[in-house]
Amino acid sequence: DVRELGADFLAFSAHKALGRMGIGVLWGRHELLDAMPPMLTGGEMIDSVTEQDATWASVPEKFEAGTQDAAGIYATGAALTYLTRTVGYDAVAARESALVPYLMGRMAELDFIDVIGPADASAHHGVVSFNVRGVHPHDVASILDASGVCIRAGHHCAQPLLTWLGVENL
């Protein structure tokens, strides 16, 4: 319950839960959303408009510019249903808890791989960031992709963190 958490906002990216890229959810306290101007403009978000002024629709409509991605919304619901009812979060956590130590152990055997973060596998929570010395991360991703292994490479929308870590890409 986000109200119990005391959160002002909660953002969710569907692709991080088996959903499609480019769709997500934003929950926010009504009074904060009401005070915010929309970032984008489009149909269905205007209550009234003149040549000089526009009055935004009420929350949430004032943030929903243009045509909604109906297929993406449906796909997100299906992905979440599959993840929660068929697979289950506990099963995902158990699988990650088994795979991460295995992966980190195998990587530790290779002197050309630098794992970013703590040596304790349980601190990685299902994500292992690494670099292969002398090879650009996008090349590593392409090579692994050819073997059926899917990873993400790049700056992961976290360039300040990468600068702090002393790396350009992962």
Place the predicted regions along the sequence by residue:
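Pyridoxal 5′-phosphate
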Residues: 1-170
